[in-house]
């Protein structure tokens, strides 16, 4: 294979999956085939999309009800020649799912890149090992928290929040994705003030915390804004990838003047991936493509919290982010939304130690504030790695957290 193989879930009311697959393969490449003169067929053969797999799935009543017609469901795979497109994500996505995405009854499940094609993508600049080296933390999951309620607040409020989270043992603190450039907490001021706070905490407590600052603005201003952030001392860039595009992420990741990790936020991605019947699958969008394009971290809804993905999907995202690939470093999985200390054993059981445990309200909502919330999570992480049930741990911060949010993991075994 020298090109790319696209895997689709299709729904066909004509009940002929093979014909539907061939129509897609032709429609996204040379347009027609059977009516072409033999000589022209020979000339265009190398550009033709080829159906390489058709698999019928069981009938699904919910799907029929939603589509208001009886359809045949199937998985098909089509190989697209590398000759047909330039080796970039806009060309790849347009080739494999451009006008087909308007069908409304087709879901792009996966894209399998040839080795030749993979060479054109940067992958994570730091990856899991590089991030761990920055923090000098190698034996446990990382803990991340989020600034909460920052809109309309000043730098003093940010510094207080940041200090409390760092003292609580949080490894990474990230901006809220809806915190943009503003007069009260402008980008460079956030970074400079944040570094002062984190250096003070490190000198006093010996704990290192990194700050992920949200890089925003118009698309053609992003590189300049990212470089300003780097010059001001940014540790990590948070980026709302799907508000801009995967190719924009790749452009930032490939720039040698932006030598910091990039954290991909999934904002807007639900518009592409939420439906089970059409769009682009979450594992492909939030896993494989983000990793290929250069994300060191990928945030996605956890299977446990307030905006839950199905467990199978969440684990598939993580698999794409962390599976061995000679071309790419591994990206950190960051299952998010509604996470509290009682979920820690689930997260470690399902995602392993190479995961970032990300919490907002589960840290800030603690009775002892963000310091207590961070300490509760760190205690839960340590206890889980020792295979000790959380309810048996004698720690006031963890006990308070379990009292508030519960302990659904009391029977979890690693």
UniProtKB/Swiss-Prot annotation:
The encoding gene is mtnW
**Cofactor binding notes:** Binds 1 Mg(2+) ion per subunit.
Xref: NCBIfam families: PRK09549.1, salvage_mtnW
Q: Where is the active site?
A: 99
The UniProt record lists the keyword Magnesium: yes
What the entry lists under PANTHER family is as follows: RIBULOSE BISPHOSPHATE CARBOXYLASE, RIBULOSE BISPHOSPHATE CARBOXYLASE LARGE CHAIN
Classification via Pfam families:
RuBisCO_large, RuBisCO_large_N
Q: Which residues carry this modification: N6-carboxylysine?
A: 174
Name of protein = 2,3-diketo-5-methylthiopentyl-1-phosphate enolase
The chemistry this enzyme catalyses reads:
5-methylsulfanyl-2,3-dioxopentyl phosphate = 2-hydroxy-5-methylsulfanyl-3-oxopent-1-enyl phosphate
Organism, per UniProt? Bacillus thuringiensis (strain Al Hakam)
């Amino acid at each position: 294979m020298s090109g790319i193989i696209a895997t689709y879930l299709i729904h066909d009311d004509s009940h002929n999956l093979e014909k539907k697959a061939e129509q897609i393969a032709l429609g996204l490449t040379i347009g027609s085939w059977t009516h072409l003169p033999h000589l022209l067929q020979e000339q265009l053969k190398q550009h033709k999309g080829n159906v390489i797999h058709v698999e019928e799935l069981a009938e699904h009543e919910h799907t029929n009800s939603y589509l208001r017609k009886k359809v045949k469901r199937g998985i098909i795979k089509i190989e697209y020649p590398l000759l047909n497109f330039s080796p970039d994500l806009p060309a790849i996505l347009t080739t494999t799912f451009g006008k087909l995405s308007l069908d409304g009854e087709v879901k792009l499940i996966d894209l399998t890149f040839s080795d030749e094609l993979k060479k054109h993508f940067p992958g994570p600049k730091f990856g899991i090992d590089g991030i761990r080296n920055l923090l000098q933390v190698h034996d446990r999951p990382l803990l991340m928290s989020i600034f909460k309620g920052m809109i309309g607040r000043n730098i003093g409020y940010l510094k207080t929040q940041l200090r409390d989270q760092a003292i609580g043992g949080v490894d990474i603190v990230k901006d809220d994705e809806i915190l943009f450039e503003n007069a009260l907490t402008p980008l460079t001021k956030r970074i400079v003030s944040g570094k002062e706070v984190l250096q003070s905490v490190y000198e006093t407590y010996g704990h290192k915390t990194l700050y992920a600052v949200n890089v925003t603005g118009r698309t053609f201003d992003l590189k300049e804004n990212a470089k300003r952030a780097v010059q001001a001392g940014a540790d990590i860039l948070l980026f709302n990838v799907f508000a801009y595009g995967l190719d924009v992420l790749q452009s930032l990741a490939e720039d040698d003047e932006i030598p910091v990790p990039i954290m991909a936020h999934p904002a807007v991605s639900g518009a592409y991936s939420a439906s089970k019947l059409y769009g682009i699958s979450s594992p492909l969008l939030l896993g494989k493509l983000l990793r290929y394009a250069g994300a060191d971290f990928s945030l996605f809804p956890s299977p446990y919290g307030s905006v839950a993905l199905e467990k199978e999907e969440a684990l598939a995202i993580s698999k794409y982010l962390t599976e061995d690939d000679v071309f790419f470093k591994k990206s950190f999985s960051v299952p998010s939304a509604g996470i509290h200390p009682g979920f820690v054993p689930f997260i470690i059981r399902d995602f392993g130690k190479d995961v970032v445990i990300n919490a907002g309200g589960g840290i800030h909502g603690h009775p002892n504030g963000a310091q207590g919330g961070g300490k509760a999570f760190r205690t839960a992480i340590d206890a889980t790695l020792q295979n000790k049930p959380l309810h048996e741990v004698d720690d006031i911060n963890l006990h308070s957290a379990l009292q508030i949010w519960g302990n659904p993991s009391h029977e979890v075994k690693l």
